């Protein structure tokens, strides 16, 4: 069986809402095409797979099951610091995106790969763990939580990559936020992912220097 093609796009630094709208356009096109293919299988057209790389200006996003109490900074202070905020349609709680963080949005039709959202999440984690390993950093999973951590076996594990997705008819959107050279001060204004007793970590200034 031939491997499905995936189109890669590097959007650079892009406004969160602009990128979210673009994701939604691609996602909706695939979902609607799958609905049409089911109704008219004789005229079936293949869906397209996309892998979007980008960075965002400072923004907090709250997932559909998130708790607004985990946003610790009010509107006037966000405006003063030039931080946007959006309630969005992915899973998970609150997170931060900003310059120095690699954001990856896979818009994939999982019917080409496997129909298992839990496997998909674990493979997203694995892609980050393997990337970190290439640079001598040990990334790990933490039981009961989605994402990638360092010091997972210690009392205060630190999160280096957050993951939150949406999936409908086995089409995915949203994805990962990988802290490479982010300003971690922005995480002080939220309870990241709604987890009070954990902290966040950078790849460059923390993990690499410590040789984790």
Regions found by a protein language model. Give the residues of each.
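N-terminal lobe of the biotin/lipoate ligase/transferase fold
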Residues: 1-157
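Short conserved catalytic/interaction loops centered on acidic-Pro-aromatic/His motifs
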Residues: 138-142, 173-174, 185-190
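Histidine/acidic-rich helix-loop-helix segments that form or flank divalent-metal centers
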Residues: 160-163
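Conserved phosphate/anionic-ligand binding catalytic regions in large, soluble enzymes, centered on
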Residues: 171, 176-179
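A hydrophobic, small-residue-rich beta->alpha segment in the mid-to-C-terminal subdomain
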Residues: 181-205
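Single conserved hydrophobic/aromatic residue that forms the stacking wall/gate
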Residues: 206-212
């Amino acid at each position: 069986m031939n491997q499905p093609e995936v189109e890669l796009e590097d959007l650079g630094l892009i406004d969160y809402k602009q990128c979210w709208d673009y994701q939604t356009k691609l996602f909706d096109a695939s979902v609607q095409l799958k609905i049409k293919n089911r109704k008219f299988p004789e005229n079936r057209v293949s869906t397209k797979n996309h892998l979007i790389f980008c960075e965002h200006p400072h923004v907090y996003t709250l997932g559909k099951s998130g708790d607004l109490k985990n946003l610790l900074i009010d509107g006037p202070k966000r405006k003063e610091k030039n931080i946007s905020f959006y309630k969005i349609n992915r899973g998970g709680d609150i997170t931060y995106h900003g310059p120095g963080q690699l954001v990856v949005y896979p818009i994939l039709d999982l019917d080409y790969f496997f129909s298992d959202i839990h496997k998909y999440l674990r493979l997203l984690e694995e892609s980050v763990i393997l990337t970190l390993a290439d640079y001598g950093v040990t990334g790990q999973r933490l039981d009961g939580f989605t994402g990638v951590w360092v010091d997972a076996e210690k009392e205060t594990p630190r999160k280096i990559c957050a993951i939150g997705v949406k999936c409908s008819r086995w089409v995915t959107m949203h994805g990962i936020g990988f802290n490479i050279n982010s300003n971690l001060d922005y995480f002080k204004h939220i309870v990241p992912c709604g987890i009070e007793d954990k902290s966040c970590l950078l790849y460059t200034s923390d993990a690499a220097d410590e040789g984790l």
